[in-house]
Amino acid sequence: MTKGILGRKVGMTQVFTESGELIAVTAVEATPNVVLQVKNIATDGYNAIQLGYQDKRTVLSNKPEQGHASKANTTPKRYVREVRDAEGEFNAGDEIKVDTFQAGDYVDVTGITKGHGFQGAIKKLGQSRGPMAHGSRYHRRPGSMGAIINRVFKGKLLPGRMGNNKRTMQNVAIVHVDVENNLLLLKGNVPGANKSLLTIKSTVKVNAKHPEVKMAGVSASATTEEA
């Protein structure tokens, strides 16, 4: 079964673990998500819940969006995503908060990477440059397209748009859950720029060996007591 929530990347900071190690963490603000729809095998062919995140002004939403949100007694949402095989029983209109996770859980984080525009083969693909000596005529170009056939083979690594791709980082540790401020602290970096949307779900690699990470001065039970 899967747990999931939508959030917004705030930025990065540092915290100390109980062992005294200083680690980098990413702060994710995940205000309460609203369950817009509950899907099941009988009606939709699969089990899932549809989550809505961040209110959208009514003037910017169309009638179908307004009608869909009204069934859950809420306003239209800017972001709508699905979580398949969600853990627990849900009804339309329920809220999912950060306390669905706890410190020590491992999650998969999906986001849109930073866009870098049109870039050459060296920056985008890490290819080697040519000689920089005078008269070389070959410095930062992609190189030969092939000496025989009069076309470019599919899959040829060439300059082009860099970044702005959907990427998932697996097995990211949750270092701390701040229920009062709707924050999750995730170990390390995650895809995307600040303020970008992140989808956080339970990790799919449940059998992987995960080292335990605990934030100094905060016990696992402290988060539950705050809630």
UniProtKB/Swiss-Prot annotation:
UniProt GO molecular function: rRNA binding; structural constituent of ribosome
Annotated TM spans: none
Record bears the keyword Mitochondrion: no
GO cellular-component term (any): cytosolic large ribosomal subunit
UniProt-listed GO biological process terms: translation
Keyword annotations: Ribonucleoprotein, Ribosomal protein, RNA-binding, rRNA-binding
Protein family membership: Belongs to the universal ribosomal protein uL3 family.
Record note on quaternary structure: Part of the 50S ribosomal subunit. Forms a cluster with proteins L14 and L19.
Name this polypeptide is given: Large ribosomal subunit protein uL3
GN (gene name): rplC
